[in-house]
């Protein structure tokens, strides 16, 4: 049996739909339950930020999580497959009309993704003061807390509604199937079997597009 960590919300639903396509059974969590047991799989419903942690510590054999979260956390897990879902960007946003100038002294950047932000500016040899926030990131430039933000952007509508605009894309993210390194060895046949099955679904979807 494989234990699968899924993030709560849309990604969990989309992933379970893939399993339904593959196995023909109904896969759905009972109301408020966090564990779904089937003959071949045990699904765990966890916070998005915790998926890779469950997989890294082998509380789950495999999991589904956004590439942005993987890059931010830097945990040593195997990235098996890009699921081509949950596509978004990590981008820099500023107040509309303001100039994106990395030569400006004492740049302040607000973000919940401190490590991605730090790497981006270090690669450009730019010294910045990173302010970690946990939500309502768009507020920071509006009240003078920060010059710019680094945040996940899907359509950009949230930034626009708050008088901000995207000035630079840092990375494109999508959901990934990941595996624990020990599980990949101990349960290699099972892991590779589900990998191949899911890959066939993703490949078929891409041909239709």
Swiss-Prot record:
GO terms for biological process: L-histidine biosynthetic process. It is found in: Cytoplasm. GO terms for cellular component: cytoplasm. It catalyses: 1-(5-phospho-beta-D-ribosyl)-ATP + diphosphate = 5-phospho-alpha-D-ribose 1-diphosphate + ATP. Disulfide bonds: none annotated. The keyword ATP-binding applies. Pathway: Amino-acid biosynthesis; L-histidine biosynthesis; L-histidine from 5-phospho-alpha-D-ribose 1-diphosphate: step 1/9. SUPFAM superfamilies: Periplasmic binding protein-like II (SSF53850). Gene3D superfamilies: Periplasmic binding protein-like II (3.40.190.10). One of its GO terms (molecular function) is ATP binding. It holds the Pfam family HisG. It comes from the Bacteria. Keywords: Amino-acid biosynthesis, ATP-binding, Cytoplasm, Glycosyltransferase, Histidine biosynthesis, Nucleotide-binding, Transferase. It is an enzyme of class 2 (transferase). Coiled coil: none annotated. Its EC number is 2.4.2.17. InterPro entries: ATP_PRibTrfase_cat (IPR013820), ATP_PRibTrfase_CS (IPR018198), ATP_PRibTrfase_HisG (IPR001348), ATP_PRibTrfase_HisG_short (IPR024893). Heteromultimer composed of HisG and HisZ subunits. Lacks the C-terminal regulatory region which is replaced by HisZ. Belongs to the ATP phosphoribosyltransferase family. Short subfamily. Catalyzes the condensation of ATP and 5-phosphoribose 1-diphosphate to form N'-(5'-phosphoribosyl)-ATP (PR-ATP). Has a crucial role in the pathway because the rate of histidine biosynthesis seems to be controlled primarily by regulation of HisG enzymatic activity. This is ATP phosphoribosyltransferase. It comes from Sulfurimonas denitrificans (strain ATCC 33889 / DSM 1251). The gene is hisG.
């Amino acid at each position: 049996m494989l234990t699968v960590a899924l993030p709560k919300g849309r990604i969990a639903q989309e992933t379970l739909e893939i399993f339904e396509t593959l196995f023909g059974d109904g896969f759905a969590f009972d109301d408020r339950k966090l564990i779904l047991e089937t003959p071949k799989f045990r699904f765990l419903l966890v916070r998005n930020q915790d998926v890779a942690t469950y997989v890294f510590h082998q509380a789950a054999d495999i999991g589904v999580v956004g590439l942005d979260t993987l890059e931010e956390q830097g945990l040593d897990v195997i990235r098996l497959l890009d699921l081509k879902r949950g596509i978004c960007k990590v981008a820099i946003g500023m107040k509309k009309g303001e100039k994106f100038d990395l030569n400006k002294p004492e740049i302040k950047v607000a973000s919940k993704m401190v490590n991605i932000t730090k790497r981006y500016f270090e690669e450009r040899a730019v010294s910045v003061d990173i302010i970690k926030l946990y939500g309502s990131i768009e507020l920071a430039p509006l009240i003078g807390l920060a010059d710019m933000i680094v945040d996940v952007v899907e359509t950009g509508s949230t930034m626009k509604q708050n008088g901000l605009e995207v000035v630079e894309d840092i990375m494109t993210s999508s959901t990934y199937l990941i595996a624990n390194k020990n599980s990949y060895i101990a349960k290699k046949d099972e892991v590779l079997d589900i990998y191949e099955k899911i890959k066939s679904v993703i490949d078929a979807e891409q041909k239709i597009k």
